[in-house]
């Protein structure tokens, strides 16, 4: 199974849930930029306060801030594979990530794109009840996602790394689909 992965998909597609399942089953490190940012916010750090204001508007945190967090996490890993969830989200972020991965001799092996309908996404996001999940913010996040991430999908498709997975259905069904495309 491939062990250096990126997960792409709109908010609510199940990236975090599926990443955790895949990592637990295969001894990989799950690097979720959303979780890392939320922990900075909870700790009340300067970076956390900056990130909180941006996230509350449904916008993306700066590339420099997220890349610094990701770099620190990747350099801190002892061994085994990893799964990046929530980064990169834009082509400039992907361009910034590549030299770091080259330096670490850990190139991406596959990019998993989780796809599903907006109605299901909105329903899932409202149901999970996070503070930054209200319908106006969710719709803005979906718009930002499409605007920023569509070119990234093409970027990884052109590199032959992209695999699409239908993210409707039960958690277990989606996990099985992902495992199948990565084997």
Curated annotation (Swiss-Prot):
Q: Specify the enzyme's EC class, one word.
A: transferase
Annotated AMP binding lies at 33, 38, 59-61, 86-89, 93, 130, 141
Where found, per UniProt? Cytoplasm
Pathway of action = Purine metabolism; AMP biosynthesis via salvage pathway; AMP from ADP: step 1/1
Identify the species of origin: Parasynechococcus marenigrum (strain WH8102)
Provide the function of this protein: Catalyzes the reversible transfer of the terminal phosphate group between ATP and AMP. Plays an important role in cellular energy homeostasis and in adenine nucleotide metabolism.
Region annotated LID, chain positions: 127-133
| Coiled coil (residue ranges) | none
Domains: entry comment:
Consists of three domains, a large central CORE domain and two small peripheral domains, NMPbind and LID, which undergo movements during catalysis. The LID domain closes over the site of phosphoryl transfer upon ATP binding. Assembling and dissambling the active center during each catalytic cycle provides an effective means to prevent ATP hydrolysis.
Catalytic activity, EC: 2.7.4.3
Identification of the protein by name: Adenylate kinase
MF annotations from Gene Ontology:
adenylate kinase activity; ATP binding
What Pfam families does the record point to? Answer: ADK (PF00406)
Q: Tell me which InterPro entries the record gives.
A: Adenylat/UMP-CMP_kin (IPR000850), Adenylat_kinase_CS (IPR033690), P-loop_NTPase (IPR027417)
Any one cellular component term from GO for this entry? cytoplasm
């Amino acid at each position: 199974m491939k062990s250096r992965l990126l997960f792409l998909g709109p908010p609510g597609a199940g990236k975090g849930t599926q990443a955790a399942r895949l990592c637990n089953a295969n001894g990989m490190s799950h690097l979720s930029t959303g979780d890392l940012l939320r922990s900075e916010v909870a700790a009340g750090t300067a970076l956390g306060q900056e990130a909180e204001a941006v996230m509350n508007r449904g916008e993306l945190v700066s590339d420099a801030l997220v890349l610094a967090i990701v770099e620190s996490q990747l350099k801190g890993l002892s061994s085994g594979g990893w799964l990046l969830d929530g980064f990169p989200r834009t082509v400039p972020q992907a361009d910034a990530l590549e030299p770091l991965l080259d330096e670490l001799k850990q190139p991406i092996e596959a990019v998993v794109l989780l796809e599903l309908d907006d109605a299901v996404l909105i329903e899932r996001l409202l149901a999970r009840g996070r503070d930054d999940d209200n319908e106006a913010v969710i719709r803005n996040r979906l718009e930002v996602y499409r605007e920023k991430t569509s070119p990234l999908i093409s970027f990884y498709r052109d590199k032959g790394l992209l695999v699409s997975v239908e993210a409707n259905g039960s958690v277990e069904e989606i996990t099985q689909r992902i495992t199948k495309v990565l084997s």
